């Protein structure tokens, strides 16, 4: 059994580490990206942009309340771009990811990573102090026994 280990074999702060790891995994799971397959659904058999070249006629914009209710492409991301297919000349909507939304998700992720790093840095400092105290105590006992 390790020195300083509890009855169950984990150091005193071990349970806290397991809780933090579980919490971190839960956060990462909650931020899973939207699958590409669900980004666009059209009412026809297949959208023209899947099988032919297209030109973006209107950049990625947030959907209006009406578009959210009526256009299935708005459902997954809340953003849509208007495209024109080259061969068939059909105008369709295609779901897209907003640069602003991506930036927000990036900074949220970075904040979580920095927060987790700070927590674990504090845990390392606390553990190092515990080990230093134990080492000093051992040295003190050795000196007293002389």
Swiss-Prot record:
Leader peptide range in chain numbering: 1-30
Membrane topology classification: Single-pass type I membrane protein
Keyword flag Cytoplasm: yes
Keyword line: Apoptosis, Cell cycle, Cell division, Cytoplasm, Cytoskeleton, Membrane, Mitochondrion, Mitosis, Signal, Transmembrane, Transmembrane helix
A single GO molecular function term of this UniProt record: protein kinase binding
Family listed: Belongs to the JTB family.
The name this protein goes by in its record: Protein JTB
Organism: Rattus norvegicus (Rat)
């Amino acid at each position: 059994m390790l020195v300083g280990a509890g009855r169950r074999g984990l150091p005193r702060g071990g349970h806290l580490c397991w809780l933090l790891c579980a919490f971190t995994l839960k956060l990462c799971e909650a931020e899973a990206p939207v699958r590409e397959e669900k980004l666009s659904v059209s009412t026809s058999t297949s959208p023209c942009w899947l099988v032919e070249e297209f030109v973006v006629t209107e950049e990625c914009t947030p959907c209006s309340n009406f578009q959210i209710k009526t256009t299935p492409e708005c459902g997954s991301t809340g953003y849509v771009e208007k495209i024109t297919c080259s061969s068939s000349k059909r105008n369709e909507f295609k779901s897209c990811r907003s640069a602003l939304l991506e930036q927000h998700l990036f900074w949220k992720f970075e904040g979580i990573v920095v927060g987790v790093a700070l927590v674990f840095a504090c845990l390392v400092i606390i553990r190092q102090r515990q080990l230093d105290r134990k080492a000093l105590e051992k040295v003190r006992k050795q000196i007293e026994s002389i």
